[in-house]
Amino acid sequence: LGLNKAHIAVEDNKQEAIAALKKHIDPHSEITVEALPSKYPQGAEKQLIQAITGRQVPSGGLPAAVGCAVFNSGTCKAIHDAVYLGQPLIRRIVTVSGDIVMHPMNLMVPIGTSFNDLLEAVGHSENPYKVLSGGPMMGVAQFDLSVPVTKGTNAVTILGRKNHFAVHTPHCIRCGKCMDVCPMHLMPLMMYQAERSGDVPELQKLGILDCIECGCCAYTCPATIPLVQSFRAGKQRVRNAMPPRKG
């Protein structure tokens, strides 16, 4: 890749982790530990690149376009184990939490472990109303708890009924809050309207493929419009309209 510097990004409220990393890094090396504000979605790769280097990945571009590569810490550990120890990726750490979880914790589990087994390990104070693969903002609801942990499962969120609210898909009131909170500086309300009308050229013009599906727009929407689901559908519309790749 031709990269000569490495930055390890850690949220600034993880002081123990920052101290531990600095203790094991040669101060004369090209590896630095960067303490970044604990705000969401700071961990998205384009946000990390801008926060650490000041470079902005162009719309539709990849980190390589600005001379960067971003790797999750878990991925780096898996690469190390595979290359240096000859160990395949057979386990991963999964954060299990939620409002009805009795003992929230990080668990090192074999890939293939069912979500049911995770629920039994942490305990819950009532029957789960909704189980998400992922966190509360970007997680995807699961309808069958026999689904397994995969290499991409980083969290399981278990919610009770009190955190459920009905989504009636009312009309947008054009308050503009979704645009204020979008970390990619997109126009969610315009994208939502374009998706509902099936206007693929407009979706492309609005840069819907740059949406990182962080959920900030849906979280702040006073009309409780399911914006993220709409944008996922819109992105699929755009991809379906693209010419097939050669080769």
What are these regions (language model features)?
Residues L1:
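Histidine-anchored nucleotide/phosphate-binding helix
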Residues D12-K14, G135-M138, R196, V238:
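Acidic, glycine-rich active-site loops and adjacent beta-strand->loop/helix elements
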Residues A20-K23, A78-A82, D117-A121, K177, ...:
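Alpha-helical scaffold segments in soluble metabolic enzymes
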